[in-house]
Regions:
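Short, aromatic/basic amphipathic alpha-helical patches
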Residues: 62-68, 210-213, 380-383
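Short, Lys/Arg-enriched N-terminal segments with co-localized hydrophobic residues
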Residues: 3-13
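Generic recognition of cysteine residues
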Residues: 6-8, 84-87, 362, 385
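C-terminal accessory "lid"/substrate-recognition subdomains
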Residues: 56, 154, 160-365, 375, ...
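Nucleotide-state-sensitive switch-loop elements of NTP-binding domains
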Residues: 15-181
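Hydrophobic side chains in well-ordered alpha-helices
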Residues: 60, 96, 122, 209, ...
Length: 415
């Protein structure tokens, strides 16, 4: 049975909007251990805790038996506009937060998401308004996005191509996410990464994992912890959250903007951006994607690509750990009538920023972050997938006749 638990620790009145920390992390990472630590060591803070659990209650009643009231509400699965099904609990969460804020008895609110939820939709919930015009942002302030990273199992889970369904954990029949998909979302959209179980790994393994996490999210603060013990000041009322900054935090985006991902020579972590202004041969690029990867450990790659056989369409590319996805991103603006372009200046300038007279906005733009990767070898392999001068001479109609093992694309861009 799905449950939505609210554990309220009694306190005094407060005047400002209720500051909120959202706690994410994969199943077994140590979220509940951290939560129990917070409940036992509140430093006189009056804290309200909302726990979203897909199964059983994770909090031992003996640890919250004093000054605690439990309030249950049915959980809802909400289909987001981007097609992802995520347990955002919009209506339920709005009701609970409104009640807690109106009581004025709490200094802080800590929301623990279920282990298979992504933090971004939860953050977006704070901008949602219900039919009465109410919004979480009217009564609460999203302060910190925290993700607990399993120091012992993260790399194993991240590199595996296992689906959540294979672990018996999904949000419904339509949930086709992989564990890698979930982990990268939780890491990239975080202000603070808490590294758990560091007592179970070596110093070298810990430092290597920290370097890898920093390459995936250079903005986040990384805090090692044992048995959930972390100073509350690192996760409560930090003032770290900024939606725009969080959306730009992923390492691949920073590399694409020229803000190089921190490189750690000791662990062989580096990043590269591959760009080109001629289309890819569909057969050669397909073979490149599907051959065994033998160039170090590819941690993360993302971007857009341009196939000759689908020259009007932009392809999307997203890889995290052992999972790779590609598909249709949309139509290149070059092939969209100008009257259908965005009318505002900012969006128009964003299009023209990548415009050339020869190809418009059509281009290859892929970012790779990896460990012990031969960058020159990778760049050479990608260059070999581009059309030759002779193939370029075939023109658009000739490109359409090139062998294309990708098959038809559908409206399902890579995540």
């Amino acid at each position: 049975m799905h449950r939505f638990e609210c554990v309220c620790l009694k306190g005094f009145a407060m005047s400002n909007r209720l500051p909120v920390t959202v706690l994410s992390g994969f199943l077994g990472a140590g979220k509940s251990t951290l939560l129990n630590h917070v409940l036992r060591n509140r430093d006189n803070l009056r804290v309200a805790v909302i726990v979203n659990d897909m199964s059983e209650i994770n909090i031992d009643a003996s640890e919250v038996q004093r000054n605690v009231s439990l309030n249950r509400a049915e959980e809802k699965l909400v289909e987001m506009s981007n097609g992802c099904i995520c347990c955002t609990l919009r209506e339920d969460l709005l009701e609970e937060v409104a009640r807690l804020a109106e009581e004025g008895r709490f200094d802080y609110l800590l929301i623990e998401s279920t282990g298979i939820s992504e933090p971004l939709p939860v953050a977006e919930t704070f901008t949602f308004r219900d039919e009465l015009g109410r919004s979480l942002s009217d009564m609460a302030r999203l302060d910190t996005m925290v993700t607990v990273v399993d120091g012992l199992n993260f790399l194993r889970d991240y590199q595996a191509a296992d689906s959540l369904a294979s672990r018996g954990e999904t949000l419904g029949e339509e949930d086709e996410r992989s564990i890698s998909d979930l982990l990268i979302e939780q890491v990239e959209f975080a202000d603070v990464l808490l590294l758990s179980k560091i007592d179970l790994i070596s110093q070298h393994e810990r430092e290597e994992l920290i370097a890898i996490l920093r390459s995936l999210n250079a903005r986040a603060q990384i805090v090692p912890m044992v048995m959930g013990q972390v100073p509350l000041a690192r996760i409560l009322d930090t003032g770290l959250f900024d939606f725009d900054q969080a959306a730009q935090a992923p390492g691949w985006l920073q590399e694409l903007r020229g803000e190089h991902v921190p490189e750690t020579e000791e662990y062989g972590i580096a990043a590269m951006t591959w760009q080109a202004r001629r289309p890819l041969h569909p057969q050669r690029f397909y073979e490149f994607i599907h051959k065994n990867w033998e160039n170090g450990r590819l941690l993360r790659s993302k971007g857009f690509f341009w196939l000759a056989s689908k020259y009007q369409e932009a392809g999307s590319w997203s890889q995290a750990g052992g999972m790779m996805r590609h598909g249709l991103a949309g139509r290149w603006w070059r092939f969209v009538p100008r009257e259908q372009w965005p009318q505002d200046v900012d969006n128009t300038n964003a299009i023209l920023k990548h415009w050339t007279a020869e190809t418009g906005d059509c281009r290859q733009e892929l970012v790779f972050i990896g460990q012990n990767i031969d960058v020159e070898k990778l760049s050479t392999a990608l260059d070999a997938c581009l059309l030759t001068d002779q193939e370029m001479g075939l023109g658009h109609m000739g490109w359409l006749r090139l062998p294309d093992p990708f098959g038809p694309w559908h409206e399902e861009a890579a995540a």
